[in-house]
């Protein structure tokens, strides 16, 4: 005998670091499935987790139920260790739940070290960079929020206090909250005494492991005048005061065209 009703509940819990949009949708096969919100996306102020509970009536339905929604990584992912997770459980009565299914994802980071010549050979502070997504320094640069000197995270959309400027210190500069992909850094602000016609633009490829969250970075493609190099997993970026201080590859390349 068939059922007149067949209640089916789905609970979704998104971790701290995710902003859940109320755009849940469901299908069985190619047919849209209606549902009601038992609990609309609700953030727990203590844990930062967002819980949503949906109720379906699956009487007379068969097939795989697929539920989709979108979420945006937010600033809290940094304090959450660059990791977000999503947990789903199902129930017939909204009380007894199946063991949870957990999905985890990570964002990553990379570092670069800015240095000059002479007294600045160990670190050059005050140089400004813009960061562009992709293999070219074109379009609108990404915006960041400064966490501390030399530490920046990707800004949320329209976040107050965000800026496209990343400023070097005498130590490493860390750029956090990024997904895997290519990023191009272009020097846009200079330190007095250094040549403005010999400035670095370079592209890195960031790979974030979704197994353990580790980040790896390599130089690829664009590397103007050879001023960037990869040493001990940190991108080393040089500024010079004259052509004789360029790395050999950059000096040779410049000589060919002068």
Stretches with model-predicted labels:
Residues 1-258:
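Solvent-exposed loop/turn and edge beta-strand elements of beta-rich ligand-binding domains
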């Amino acid at each position: 005998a068939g059922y007149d009703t067949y209640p089916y509940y789905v609970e979704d819990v998104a971790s701290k670091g995710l902003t859940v949009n109320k755009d849940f949708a469901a299908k069985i096969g190619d047919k849209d499935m209606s549902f009601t919100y038992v609990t609309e996306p609700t953030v727990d102020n203590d844990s930062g987790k967002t819980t949503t509970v949906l109720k379906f009536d699956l009487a007379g339905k068969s097939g795989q139920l697929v539920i989709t929604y979108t979420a945006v990584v937010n600033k809290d992912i940094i304090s959450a260790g660059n990791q977000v997770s999503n947990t789903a459980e199902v129930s017939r009565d909204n009380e007894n739940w199946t063991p949870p299914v957990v999905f985890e994802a990570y964002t990553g980071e990379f570092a670069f070290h800015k240095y000059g010549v002479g007294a600045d050979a160990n670190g050059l502070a005050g140089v400004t960079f813009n960061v562009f997504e992709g293999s070219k320094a074109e379009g609108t640069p990404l915006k960041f929020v400064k966490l501390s000197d030399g530490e920046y995270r990707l800004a949320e959309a329209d976040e107050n206090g965000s800026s496209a400027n990343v400023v070097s210190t005498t130590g490493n500069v860390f750029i956090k909250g990024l997904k895997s992909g290519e990023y191009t850094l272009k020097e846009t602000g200079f330190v007095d005494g250094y040549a403005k016609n010999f400035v670095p633009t370079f592209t890195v490829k960031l790979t974030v492991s979704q197994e353990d969250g580790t980040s790896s970075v390599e130089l690829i493609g664009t590397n103007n005048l050879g001023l960037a190099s990869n040493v001990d997993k940190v991108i080393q970026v040089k500024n010079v005061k004259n052509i004789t201080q360029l790395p050999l590859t950059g000096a040779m390349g410049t000589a060919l065209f002068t």
